[in-house]
Design a protein with these regions (language model features):
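Charged, amphipathic alpha-helical segments
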Residues: 17-29
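Histidine- and/or cysteine-centered catalytic micro-motif in compact active-site loops
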Residues: 9, 18, 42-44
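Short, surface-exposed beta-strand-loop junctions and turns on beta-sheet-rich folds
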Residues: 12, 21-22, 46, 70
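A short, compositionally biased
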Residues: 1, 32-36
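Mixed-charge, glycine-accented linear interaction segment located at domain edges/termini
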Residues: 69-117
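Short, structured protein-protein interaction patches enriched in aromatics and acidic/basic residues
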Residues: 35-67, 71
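Non-catalytic effector/regulatory segments
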Residues: 3-4, 53, 77
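Short, extreme N-terminal segment that most often corresponds to the first beta-strand
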Residues: 1-16
Length: 117
């Protein structure tokens, strides 16, 4: 299982290597063109019920980490489908079979202290 790191959060998003390789091509192509879009998925078993979406934008840092040292064989048709779906209002939706995201960490809800006091 590969990992997508999005933004400064450092929260890993586990995605099967082959799916991540195809997603990487679609994402980098769109961002190189300056085109933003969403990538969404339903939470997998072991996570709180719900879904997540990422807003892909050229100014947000991304890192793709693959478990397999050999590059995946890419399917042009799958990449084209990802590109088409990225152009829709719903964006790219990942199938649960491609995900291994693990538990979603709790967000710290403590209020920020006011330094003026």
């Amino acid at each position: 299982v590969g990992t997508l790191y999005y933004g400064d959060s450092g929260t890993p998003i586990g995605i099967e290597d082959n799916a991540l390789a195809h997603l990487k091509v679609a994402i980098t192509t769109k961002l190189r063109r300056g085109e933003s879009f969403t990538v969404s998925w339903r939470h997998t078993e072991g996570q709180p019920r719900g879904r997540s979406s990422l807003w892909m934008h050229p100014s947000i840092p991304l890192r793709f980490v693959f478990d397999d040292p050999e590059p995946a064989d890419l399917d042009r048709g799958w990449i084209e489908e990802l590109m088409r779906s990225a152009n829709t209002a719903g964006g790219v939706t990942l199938d649960s079979e491609h995900l291994d995201t693990g538990p979603i960490p709790a967000i710290d809800t403590q209020p920020i202290a006011d330094d003026a006091e």
